[in-house]
Amino acid sequence: MATVILFVAWMACLMVGVCYQEFQTQQNFPDISNPSQELNQEPAHRIVQLDSIQNNGALNMSTGNVLNMSPPPPSPCLSRAKIRHAFKYVTTILSCVIFLVGIVGNSTLLRIIYKNKCMRNGPNVLIASLALGDLFYILIAIPIISISFWLSTGHSEYIYQLVHLYRARVYSLSLCALSIDRYRAVASWNRIRSIGIPVRKAIELTLIWAVAIIVAVPEAIAFNLVELDFRGQTILVCMLPMEQTSDFMRFYQEVKVWWLFGFYFCLPLACTGVFYTLMSCEMLSIKNGMRIALNDHMKQRREVAKTVFCLVVIFALCWLPLHVSSIFVRLSATVKRACILKNKRSCIMAEIQTGVNYQLLMVMNYTGINMASLNSCIGPVALYFVSRKFKNCFQSCLCCWCHRPTLTITPMDEKGSGGKWKANGHDLDLDRSSSRLSNKYSSS
């Protein structure tokens, strides 16, 4: 419930900035009769505006082959698209909140899994991989996003592009691995889960990060700092150059948007849908006697499955706006090119990247960037409210930073096989080694 409230509050703040942006845009874009009047040359933020620039360039190249009777392309924008100060302030404040919550939440989550032996298992290792990728993104990309609103450089945009796409790959592959792991756990219900990191899971985690690096090679090679001339000003932009030398890079340039949407967004959702459907069928096929005997055991696995499903839903909600905006820009450029080639002067979509509509595309793009950044800090918050075990660990870990925990020994039997650790009002069961150690000191 609290996760939903946080998500709604985040969207409300973004919508306030968007509404103010549109209001200011309508006031600052009157009917201009003299295009040569002096324009405001405020620097514009240029992160993830690559497809717009690239498609405009491709459009100008394609119109050169049209017959003389074809209509000329639409006139260029009278001013550079820019983000108003209200939207800058809102996004900067929200980026600072993401930075603080993400640093505390993800570092605490990694500490919990590292310190507690009972938390070192297969699914938690994959969750730790998600937290490590989010922490890596927060430390590098979030400061670049905040600073680039006020001072943008091409080199920082290049770093942001690589970190952003690499983190998206790690996240999507880890979610796929989590869905497969949950199905295997339910399908092999008679397998007792051991404490510790299995060798197979360590190899799987290494492959996830290695595959993410390999898939990142096209972007690392293709993305380059390109100098663009706009009304006498030289702009340094990180983008895919319009002229590629190899056939593979030209093909990648055409399918890039659909590749990112299919691999980074649809693949985790498809894996979750398929394996969770199989998992539901497997749980329904268990006999009643087996279900009663393994009631507690299956409850734990259902709780982990619910946690993974919650992470996938949050991933879908946070990344959908960014992919929708990228696809919209791509489709609008395609329709615009088709309208010009078919000699339709009054095509509505032909004006979609000029004037006020281009401002709307920028707002959509920045909303998608902020929502994708929100995904890097909301994972630990979701785990706190969904998983009872993670909630107890978060409370004990965060409280022990403020107060020294007190250890009270309560022997459960004469063998000393039980014990409790009371820290700040929370009772947590000790493992066997801690119980034997505490029983030794209590007997002495």
From Swiss-Prot:
Annotated signal sequence range: 1-18
Transmembrane regions: 89-113, 125-145, 162-180, 202-226, 255-279, 308-328, 366-386
Gene Ontology biological process terms, A to Z: developmental pigmentation; endothelin receptor signaling pathway; enteric nervous system development; regulation of blood pressure; vasoconstriction
InterPro entries, per database record: Endthln_rcpt, GPCR_endothelin_rcpt, GPCR_Rhodpsn, GPCR_Rhodpsn_7TM
Record's compositionally biased regions (Low complexity): 435-444
Membrane topology designation: Multi-pass membrane protein
Residue numbers on the Extracellular membrane side: 19-88, 146-161, 227-254, 329-365
Cellular component GO terms, alphabetical: plasma membrane
Source organism, top-level taxon: Eukaryota
Glycosylation sites: N60
Entry annotated with the keyword Flavoprotein: no
UniProt-recorded Gene Ontology molecular function terms: endothelin receptor activity
Composition bias type Basic and acidic residues, residue spans: 424-434
Membrane-side (Cytoplasmic) residue stretches: 114-124, 181-201, 280-307, 387-444
Cell compartment(s), UniProt: Cell membrane
Record bears the keyword Mitochondrion: no
Stated role: Receptor for endothelin-3. Mediates its action by association with G proteins that activate a phosphatidylinositol-calcium second messenger system.
Annotated protein name in UniProt: Endothelin-3 receptor
Organism of this sequence: Xenopus laevis (African clawed frog)
